[in-house]
Amino acid sequence: MRLTVVGCAGSFPGPDSAASCYLVEADDASGRTWRVVLDLGSGALGVLQRHVDPAEVDLIGLSHLHPDHMADLCGLYVFLKYHPRGGRPRRVVVHGPFGTASRIADAYGLEPGESMGDHLTVHTWQPGHPVAVGPLTLTPVAVEHPVPAYGVRVEGPAEDDPSRRVVLAYTGDTDACAGLDELAAGADVLLAEAAFVEGRDDAVRGIHLTGRRAGEAAAGGAVGRLVLTHLPAWNDAADAVTEAREVYAGPIDVAAPGMVVAL
């Protein structure tokens, strides 16, 4: 299983990155590559096409319905509906919080009675209920954010030994909470947002992690590797790493577009 960072800018596209989007791929025993996209935020669809044909994505998992995590589903709908390649209608499966289908339709501006169903098959996450995608298993975990939000644990075959199972835990957007602890527990890689900064953002809780709180989740969950992401353009990534390093002794990286993590 491997993770490719498509976009990692926090809250809006930055000068060097699209908003949140992460491609997870794994090969099954026959050699077929299965592809899951975690979030498809503002500006991400264009960058995603550097890595994969969007019509070949097996599932898109949305952490929540803020635009920096789902806005480019409107563009994906256009890609699937109007691409001149012909043949049967292209359809991509989407899992997200309750109301995902109506939110996408509203954002696109569908008329009453129109549907995106020929091209986007939308399902609602059920917390704790795994979703199988080839050799991958996705388990949503409810986390703390101002809107309904989920982290996602992705379990799949290790790159160096497919008989061994590994776990990528993606926080989406969250503050410290019991769901975050559940999400991180025993993960090989914790892909954790760190949009806030200790001292600067202390008065605002229930929205985002700091580097320190991401590090605390990694330490508490005995995580193998921490990858910090979702940093807005005005943050200094070095500050997030310094905060996390104060409480977590394992490897720490900062996500960057094109970064590949083999699990």
Regions found by a protein language model. Give the residues of each.
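Binuclear metal-dependent hydrolase catalytic cores
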Residues: 1-170, 175, 180-182, 241-263
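Cap/insert and terminal regions of metallo-dependent hydrolase folds
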Residues: 176-261
